């Protein structure tokens, strides 16, 4: 690999590490992979507010589904 590619990869890793630290402080419960995917989506034109809304909605739906499965008789 050319040194420039290694530098870019290292810089990207550092950015994700910093974002993960911020994410942890804000209790977002997003891991590094999820943050990386969010960054990629935003870099490709996805509206950050819309992305945040989708993540919140998916978490709400997942929580409701989990509760429903725990409450249903087997």
From Swiss-Prot:
Subcellular location: Cytoplasm, Cytoskeleton, Microtubule organizing center, Spindle pole body
Keyword Zinc in record: no
Keyword Cytoplasm in annotation: yes
Keywords attached to this entry: Cytoplasm, Cytoskeleton
Alphabetical list of Pfam families matching this protein: MOZART1
SS bonds (residue pairs): none
BP terms from Gene Ontology: gamma-tubulin complex localization; microtubule nucleation by interphase microtubule organizing center; mitotic spindle assembly
GO cellular component: cytoplasm; gamma-tubulin complex; gamma-tubulin ring complex; interphase microtubule organizing center; mitotic spindle pole body; spindle
Subunit and interaction comment: Part of the gamma-tubulin complex.
Role summary: Required for gamma-tubulin complex recruitment to the microtubule organizing center (MTOC).
Similarity comment: Belongs to the MOZART1 family.
Protein name stated in the entry: Mitotic-spindle organizing protein 1
């Amino acid at each position: 690999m050319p040194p420039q590619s290694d530098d870019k990869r290292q810089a990207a890793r550092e950015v994700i590490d910093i974002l993960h630290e911020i994410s942890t402080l804000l209790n977002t419960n997003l891991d590094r992979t999820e943050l990386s995917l969010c960054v990629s989506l935003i870099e490709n034109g996805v509206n950050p507010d819309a992305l945040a809304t989708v993540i919140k909605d998916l978490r709400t739906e997942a929580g409701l589904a989990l509760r429903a499965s725990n409450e249903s008789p087997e």
